[in-house]
Amino acid sequence: MTDEIRPDPNFHLYLLVGQSNMAGRGKIDSLSTPNNPRVLMLTEENKWIVAKDPVHFDKPRVAGVGPGLAFAQEMMLFEKDEKVRIGLIPCAVGGTTIDMWQPGKDAYKGQYHPYDDAVRRLLIAMEDGVLKGIVWHQGEGDSNEERSKVYIDKLEKLVNLFRNESNNINTPFVAGELGYYMYILV
């Protein structure tokens, strides 16, 4: 018999979803080494380890530094309770459109099922901790004029789907975006 409480209310989970800007393609350097044993990540095999870049595993040959680890480290700077740990649930898939993030949809000829895979990993992680937020960084795949007109509506529906899966309609949602550029390449 153990005294461990599951899910642990001091294990704060963050679902990391989107495309390559979330997954990360940046060069790994000395700043990318694990430095906080209270910041963990869920591996592709669904095991918790100390977080390190690359956090995501969607495309191992190009995986690199993304915003996930920096986000968790920044969150820890403001956490006063020494019992709190952060668990990152990496689920981004580079090159996906928001339509590929709908239930039952796939990407790359069935290699990935972005939404379904994310929900499966989220539910596994929630056996150990409590979802505190969803971090989304996607949009380049939907940046043309036609797709961008319906993007916000689709994103709102997706957010609500994730919130329903976590049984908390008030789960905070953070969306990253790219800078606006006043030129067009021709």
Annotate the PLM regions.
Residues 1-186:
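Cell-envelope and extracellular/periplasmic
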